[in-house]
């Protein structure tokens, strides 16, 4: 619960502890949520690692090799939470970073507004829509930045911003000190996802999700000429074994 006239933030940092693979720490009972252990870790950009079919040898006697393409940066993120707005003056901001930009959805009773922080902010503007958020009520809010478009849902209903929610990704410049993949430390490592509150509000059931990227680095050339399958109306084609290791 936040109750202050000034805005304060909760920021996520991706602390991905290395797997205890071998040697004396293979059976270390220390939980990954141990505060002392977390304090020693450095945040990383959010990546596309999947535990399923990860290409890792669980037997610590044999040599361990990392063969999967699961360390690629993921910038398409989804942030959701249940928020109770105490008054008509309450302001809640969901923020997602991607490269040189930070994108925001500002929720207030009766209105939601989108913003782009950084390069391209003037061209994007501040598109705004009326919404059904009410003071004193509890609402489920969801904000996503996927495929160069911002998405907003309130209580399961999408708020339609039309083409105003689309944006053109900006290339980082030398001053941004970006990684070759495109992520920027100040945004994608220090604060990839955040929630800011001004006034009184209670935030519950906070969830951060990421898109899943399927990459291919070493597939045979003939895989580029697949067979054609026709799916009839009312039917679907089920694909399994979906992980970065096997894609």
Enumerate the language-model features and the residues they cover.
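Soluble "head" domains of membrane/secretory-pathway proteins
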Residues: 1-247
């Amino acid at each position: 619960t936040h109750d202050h006239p000034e805005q304060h933030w909760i920021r996520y940092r991706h602390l991905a502890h290395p797997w205890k693979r071998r040697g004396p720490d293979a059976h270390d009972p220390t939980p990954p949520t141990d505060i002392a252990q977390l304090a020693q870790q450095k945040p990383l950009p959010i990546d596309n690692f999947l535990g399923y079919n990860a290409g890792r040898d669980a037997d610590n006697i044999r040599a361990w090799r990392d063969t999967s393409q699961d360390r690629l940066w993921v910038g398409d993120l989804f942030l959701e939470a249940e928020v109770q707005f105490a008054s008509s003056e309450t302001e809640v901001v969901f923020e997602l970073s991607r490269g040189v930009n930070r994108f925001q959805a500002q929720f207030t009773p009766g209105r939601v507004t989108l913003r782009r922080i950084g390069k391209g902010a003037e061209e994007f503007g501040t598109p705004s829509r009326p919404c059904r958020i009410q003071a004193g009520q509890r609402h489920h809010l969801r904000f996503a930045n996927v495929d160069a478009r911002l998405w907003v849902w309130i209580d399961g209903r999408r708020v339609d911003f039309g083409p105003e929610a689309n944006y053109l990704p900006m290339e980082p410049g030398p001053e941004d000190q970006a990684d070759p993949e495109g992520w920027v430390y100040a945004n994608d490592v220090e604060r990839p996802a955040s929630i800011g509150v001004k006034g009184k509000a209670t935030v519950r059931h906070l969830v951060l999700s990421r898109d899943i990227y399927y990459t291919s680095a070493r597939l045979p050339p003939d895989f580029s000429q697949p067979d054609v399958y026709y799916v009839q109306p009312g039917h679907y084609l089920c694909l399994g074994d979906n992980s970065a290791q096997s894609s």
